[in-house]
From Swiss-Prot:
Nucleotide-binding recorded as keyword: no
Source organism of this protein record: Homo sapiens (Human)
Keyword set includes Repeat: yes
Protein name per its UniProtKB record: Protein zyg-11 homolog A
Chain's role: Probably acts as a target recruitment subunit in an E3 ubiquitin ligase complex ZYGA-CUL2-elongin BC.
SUPFAM superfamilies: ARM repeat (SSF48371), RNI-like (SSF52047)
Length: 759
């Protein structure tokens, strides 16, 4: 039996995304709210069942059935999804060895495969693009290049190669890119790539785009070799550059074909290269994109003048600089700015710098300030926050700041305008951050705060078991009262969402029950029935529902004595109903019900049976029904048992119809604890209470409880009561009413196998 009432926050005037002002936000809502494509659903099923569908080679790797054939686009998407899900391994990569799939665009980003698996699976295909960024150390960059060069077709036709890895042996020097003569786009970001390698690469005949960010290059003069064909140059955080400013600018000045230049840097380095570049009038005449984020001494005036002299410019990166707040950057048509001066600039920065943790941190810091009093739902921004968290799982500052931004973007009703799938992703990323940083308290607080959001806690899919473990651990930390209240509140709701089996598996359950009882005892001693007290009672009630383990912990920690003290201290019906609800849960556990057959407990229950408050009387009656149904508990108290049964019968006779309303919302996980009561014809009072209770919930929520009657085979018991000669007319009447309601609910879904009864 459970009681589920959770007061929500009073929402502010929330404004949904405006299609004209926030087209991207509307697109995100539509995308996230749309069902997955049929292709993706099929691919997910295929990936989940690879072991069943594939045969095994002698070397232990998998092989698809010979007669299967994948269109190229589907094969490439299949590989992307496998990689995204972390399912691409040496064992599974082998499915790309056969003739069932032909690949041209290969993405193995962050994959954990060996050199041998990579060469066998992918280097036989006619690849034109390969994204091997952030692959595991088992696949070093020299081996990737060597594998690609083993295929003559790839040597001549591979157009795009993206690398990002520090996994190069220390004694490795030259990387032999020169054989890949078809390369147009090359990224060696974060690779042990030297000046000699740059000289090698600069001679590639078709090279147009080059990213040498965070490499070991000390001199970029070799770029003059490809000055007539290089259109895009990215050299973010080129920390080893040993040239003077004038020497660097002299090289850049010669790159007449350059359309895109990125010389952004870490703010802490205080590089003034961008400052000097902005002063040049005879440089980059055709540039359309300039990134100088992180540069020192950058002013609005200098950037504005530079752009006015190059009217074709479409993008400028100004994050972590002193520039970007001028009206020029908002009024210039067609100009996109990645910066921190406005939401649009921050959005552009989060999108463009998603793989650069230094700038993700900066953008998130600005975003937190901008969204502190946010009253407009911004799903596109929340999605960018999620991308930042996903791309930098081990960066504490990214995770912490992102968690704070996520709170700002979803609190006080804003979550209602967010797609459930997006909220689910963010919540799962928060829990991933908790696992990566288990001792960072502020991150834990942010996660707990997010769980207090009723939209997230009730509607959003995430691992409730992990969440319960986290919240219960937090509960036992004796934090400040406000955080304690939140932890108790979340526990009370999560307890409803766990199966009894999951609750029993919680290692933290014993300590949580003990801590909750300590709170109840303290509040009772202080005569303080505040919100924390009420949430704590509810949490204990819900934790013990259907959980013998939790009930046992309750008894072992003097829970009965504490709850008797509660009943003697407080007379409010809201408190009484919660106490009696929990005692109902204990009464349902046969091994523990004897603990309730004491003078103290029975005195209070019998007194509350006559309460004017319907729910209080109802719960007291339930305890009496369960206790008196077991005659073994009353061997020396038979007179008392008969008296209780008489009082129970008289009380039920005075109750209104079973369809009446109660202040508390009564729900059940199962009817199975009622079945022994339904078959107890020797004690009609017990049977009558069970029927009244079942009819009450069936009338309130027929879709749930009529289905439960079928699944748990309770219909036959009701039919038996209708036909049994010892059943009282009142019991037969209620049983008939339940069956009538059942017929009405399922009249369009009649199935004779559900129950041997006439429809």
């Amino acid at each position: 039996m459970v009681h589920f009432l959770h007061p929500g926050h009073t929402p502010r005037n929330i404004v949904p995304p405006d299609a004209q002002k926030d087209a991207l936000g509307c697109c995100v809502v539509q995308e996230e709210a749309s069902p997955y494509t049929l292709v993706n659903i099929c691919l997910n099923v295929l990936i989940a069942n690879l072991e069943k569908l594939c045969s095994e080679r002698p070397d232990g790797t998998l092989c698809l059935p010979e007669h299967w054939s994948f269109p190229q686009e589907v094969a490439e998407r299949f590989l992307r999804v496998m990689t995204w899900q972390g399912k691409l391994t040496d064992r599974t990569a082998s499915i790309f060895r056969g003739n069932q799939m032909k690949l041209k665009l290969v993405n193995i980003q962050k994959a954990k495969i060996s050199t041998a698996a990579f060469i066998k699976a992918f280097c036989r295909h006619k690849l034109i693009e390969l994204n091997a960024t952030a692959v595991h150390a088992d696949l070093p960059v020299p081996d990737i290049i060597s594998g690609l060069c083993s295929n003559r077709w790839i040597q001549q036709n591979l157009q795009c190669l993206l690398l990002d890895s520090t996994s190069i042996p220390q004694n490795s020097r030259l990387l032999f890119f020169s054989q890949l003569t078809g390369l147009r786009i090359l990224s060696v970001f974060n690779v042990c790539f030297h000046t000699e390698d740059l000289a090698n690469v600069s001679q590639l005949p078709r090279l147009e785009s080059l990213d040498i960010s965070n490499t070991l290059v000390t001199d970029i003069s070799a770029l003059l070799t490809c000055k007539d064909r290089l259109k895009s140059l990215t050299m973010h955080y080129l920390k080893c550059l040993a040239m003077t400013k004038s020497q660097i600018l002299a090289v850049i000045r010669e790159l007449k074909c350059l359309l895109h230049l990125d010389i952004s840097d870490h703010r802490q380095l205080k590089s003034d290269l961008a400052f000097h570049l902005l002063q040049q009038k005879d440089i980059l005449p055709n540039v359309v994109s300039l990134d100088i984020s992180g540069g020192n001494c950058i002013t609005d005036e200098a950037v504005e003048l530079f752009i006015r002299l190059r009217p074709a410019m479409q993008f400028v990166g100004l994050l972590a600089t002193d520039a970007g707040s001028s009206d020029f950057f908002t009024t210039k048509q067609g100009l996109r700015v990645a910066g921190g001066a406005s939401m649009s600039q921050i959005s552009e920065a989060l999108s463009r710098y998603r793989n650069r943790s230094c700038f993700v941190k900066e953008a998130l810091h600005r975003l937190f300030t901008e969204t502190f009093s946010m009253e407009v739902t911004m799903p596109a921004i929340l999605k960018l926050v999620a991308i930042g968290m996903r791309n930098h799982p081990l960066d504490l500052r990214v995770q912490f700041t992102a968690s704070a931004c996520a709170l700002n973007l979803t609190r006080q009703g804003l979550a209602k305008g967010m797609p459930v799938r997006l909220l689910s992703e963010v919540t799962c990323l928060l829990f991933k951050a908790l696992k990566n940083f288990p001792h960072y308290q502020q991150l834990q607080k942010n996660c707990l705060l997010s769980l207090t959001n009723s939209r997230i806690l009730v509607d959003v899919p995430f691992d409730r078991f992990d969440a319960a473990k986290f919240v219960m651990r937090w509960l036992c930390k004796h934090e400040n009262p406000k955080m304690q209240t939140m932890a108790v509140s979340v526990t009370s709701i999560l307890a409803l969402q766990l199966s009894p089996e999951q609750t029993a598996q919680l290692e933290e359950l014993f300590m949580a029950v003990k801590e909750l009882l300590a709170i109840v005892k303290q509040k009772t001693t202080e005569n303080l029935d505040d919100v924390t007290f009420l949430f704590t009672l509810k949490a204990l009630w819900n934790l013990t529902d259907g959980s013998p383990a939790a009930c046992k912990h309750f008894i072992e920690n003097q829970g009965l004595q504490i709850f008797i003290q509660v009943l003697e201290t407080f007379s409010e019906s809201a408190i009484q109903s919660k106490v009696l609800g929990l005692l109902n849960n204990i009464a349902e556990v046969r091994e523990l019900s004897s603990k309730l057959v004491t003078e103290d407990v029975l005195k209070h229950i019998n007194s509350l049976l006559c309460s004017r408050e319907m729910e209080v009387s109802y719960f007291a009656a339930g305890i009496i029904a369960h206790l008196t149904s077991d005659r073994q508990l009353w061997i020396s108290r038979d007179f008392q048992r008969r008296t209780l049964l008489q009082d129970l019968h008289a009380t039920i006779q005075n109750w209104p119809s079973s369809s009446c309303k109660m202040t508390a919302l009564v729900t059940y996980r199962s009817f199975k604890t009622f079945f022994p009561l339904l078959g107890n014809f020797s004690q009609p009072e017990v049977q009558l209470w069970a029927l009244w209770a079942m009819y009450h919930v069936c009338s309130k929520n027929p879709s749930k409880y009529c289905k439960m009657l079928v699944e748990e085979e309770g219909l036959q018991l009701l039919c038996d009561i209708q036909e049994h000669s010892e059943a009282t007319p009142k019991a037969q009447q209620i049983a008939a009413s339940i069956l009538d309601d059942f017929r009405m609910h399922f009249m369009n879904y009649q199935r004779p196998t559900l129950c041997q009864m006439p429809f």
